[in-house]
C-alpha cells in the first residue's frame, strides 16, 4: 500500500528541479499523487475502511493546497505539473 523506495526514487528523478531535491512542491505533489492512487486501489477492495478514507481526504487536501501554491507562484509550472501527472485541472 505504501510507495516502494524504488518508485519514490523514480518520482524524485522525474520531478526534481535539482539533484538532491526532495522538498519542492512538484516532488511533493507527485509523491502525494502516488499515495492517493494506492489508496484508491485499496478502496476498490475495502469499501468500508472509513479510517483510511479520512487519511485519503487529508492527502487530497494537502495536494490541493500544494497545487494552489504552485499555481499562485508560477502558472506555467502548474500547467506542466498537472499535464505530467494527468490531473484533471
Swiss-Prot record:
CDD domains: Ribosomal_S15p_S13e
GO cellular component terms attached to this protein's record: cytosolic small ribosomal subunit
A biological-process GO annotation: translation
GO terms, molecular function: rRNA binding; structural constituent of ribosome
One Pfam family cited in the UniProt record for this chain: Ribosomal_S15
UniProt keywords, alphabetically: Ribonucleoprotein, Ribosomal protein, RNA-binding, rRNA-binding
Family named by the database record: Belongs to the universal ribosomal protein uS15 family.
HAMAP family: Ribosomal_uS15_B (MF_01343_B)
Role summary: One of the primary rRNA binding proteins, it binds directly to 16S rRNA where it helps nucleate assembly of the platform of the 30S subunit by binding and bridging several RNA helices of the 16S rRNA.
Subunit composition and interactions: Part of the 30S ribosomal subunit. Forms a bridge to the 50S subunit in the 70S ribosome, contacting the 23S rRNA.
Protein name (database record): Small ribosomal subunit protein uS15
Gene name for this UniProt entry: rpsO
Amino acid at each position: 500500500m505504501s510507495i516502494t523506495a524504488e518508485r519514490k526514487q523514480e518520482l524524485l528523478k522525474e520531478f526534481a528541479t535539482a539533484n538532491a531535491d526532495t522538498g519542492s512542491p512538484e516532488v511533493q505533489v507527485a509523491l502525494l499523487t502516488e499515495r492517493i492512487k494506492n489508496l484508491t486501489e485499496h478502496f476498490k477492495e475495502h469499501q468500508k475502511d472509513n479510517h483510511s478514507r479520512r487519511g485519503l481526504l487529508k492527502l487530497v487536501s494537502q495536494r490541493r493546497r500544494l497545487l494552489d501554491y504552485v499555481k499562485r507562484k508560477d502558472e506555467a509550472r502548474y500547467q506542466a505539473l498537472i499535464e505530467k501527472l494527468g490531473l484533471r485541472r
